[in-house]
């Protein structure tokens, strides 16, 4: 009998009879390995545990201990969901789009016709049938078929037919079969439905087919799955917490912002409370940058299209830009998608000397991005945004020093906002594919070493990501997890060798020659005001630290007639001290007014009655506390001003 040769991750090479399956390979090693093996991998492609290995090559067994096994479980759970739906009479003719795994779960896009779509109310019935199919322990097998066979199998499902027709002519087409259910699938599934024991359907949302608003709207059914029931329960609890932190919900409840189709999709309107938070952030970051040697500028939100042709944005970023405006005189103006070309113009508008370097330019610059409507979300994904942007033009030999300076400032900002959960990622070019990057090997090697040395000198932990650098230079990303569990980039320091060349930037060097080229560093400390505010809303759960809170003090007179004048006097003193205070004038019970102040997450509530008026004191209740403390007005003012000046951190 012919043999195949399999090379294992440890380098070992073993021969097996032709017709061997991954389960047989696993059993030849140990029964315990076979029991926990989810899938095989041959030459980088998944192969089911019960499918025949048809070629020699690199082989790997994926077990439940491997992180990617969870992806396979969730992918399989989406198929389980589809099979269960087809068994429910009212969904017997349902059409399916795609059903991938995603971070923390899975989804399947479905279309059952207008007025009869899948809803949350259907979940108990769907889950019951899913559990029944799990007990049936149906084997999941892959099979290669022809294009004609695929079109015949999925003839009644227009979305699957479209997917088949879009496949390249020479591409292999495979299906996954579990009982009476067939999926168009490339592999990466558990051995049988019996493996998918612990899952939960979580939500339903509308989603355009293939993310295109010109296509039909489908129902996207979301779920999650884990190897252990406890992990499912923990994930559901995390999601419930995430709902409570959702910046869109809190933004509505606390009157921070709103969005409206009448105004336009992706164009949030900042209400007074939200505008106050944003103003505090803007003032803070501007002052921080000024104190670190930055020069703040204002540059136009519109620029000549040629500026973006020179920068390369028009060639590589056009689909994310709004169409140019024809001014009728040969000039085309463009809503800027980025601020860097404008800052380059600031540097380049007159001759520069090394004595002016590093030149640090910063701006709260408004930008516009042509985002599809399906991608828009509250403040975190918008079409108009204001970026805390900065660019430094530096001598190449001073790069490491400037990098440290920016990074030190970043960490000071995180400290003031009480941001603790973040990690550093250094992104390098791919050493095996250098032709993808700006062509200057010496500059790449030197700059990557400088960034690494700077991180080491500062004693910071980081991980390195080869191949993740931009075309024009290495970078540092600061990664964080939002309260909703999504990883996003909080800050970036990006080295750029390309734009100084494209715009022919030069400065007069120490040798008196004017042919020296600066290195450009792009950096964003807090990103856009929109996304950063969304992040803060969710991180603080709407209970902002005193220095950021829209209203810092709510003053409640026990009787407006008897104590109103004193309340107004206290308010005036607080406002004179630069604080934001309000006197409650509603005619309601004291308990209700105090609860309302707590619901609105106001840091300090003052209750003023006869005793306080007569003794020139205030009775103070901090947000989240049940106890009150009576103190002199001067003591309270000192307390709250100390709180504000210390960014509401615990005294160190």
Curated annotation (Swiss-Prot):
Q: Which residues form the TGS domain?
A: 1-63
Gene Ontology CC annotations of this record:
cytoplasm
What's its EC? 6.1.1.3
Q: Which cofactor does it need?
A: Zn(2+)
Gene Ontology biological-process entries: threonyl-tRNA aminoacylation
Q: Which InterPro entries match?
A: aa-tRNA-synt_IIb, aa-tRNA-synth_II, aa-tRNA-synth_II/BPL/LPL, Anticodon-bd, Anticodon-bd_dom_sf, Beta-grasp_dom_sf, TGS, TGS-like
- Molecular function terms from GO: ATP binding; catalytic activity, acting on a protein; metal ion binding; threonine-tRNA ligase activity; transferase activity; tRNA binding
Keyword annotations: Aminoacyl-tRNA synthetase, ATP-binding, Cytoplasm, Ligase, Metal-binding, Nucleotide-binding, Protein biosynthesis, RNA-binding, tRNA-binding, Zinc
Q: What is its main location?
A: cytoplasm
Cofactor, how bound (note): Binds 1 zinc ion per subunit.
Give a short account of what the protein does.
Answer: Catalyzes the attachment of threonine to tRNA(Thr) in a two-step reaction: L-threonine is first activated by ATP to form Thr-AMP and then transferred to the acceptor end of tRNA(Thr). Also edits incorrectly charged L-seryl-tRNA(Thr).
Which protein family is it in? Belongs to the class-II aminoacyl-tRNA synthetase family.
Subunit field text? Homodimer.
PANTHER family reported in the protein's UniProt record: THREONINE--TRNA LIGASE 1 (PTHR11451:SF56), THREONINE-TRNA LIGASE (PTHR11451)
User: Can you name this protein?
Assistant: Threonine--tRNA ligase
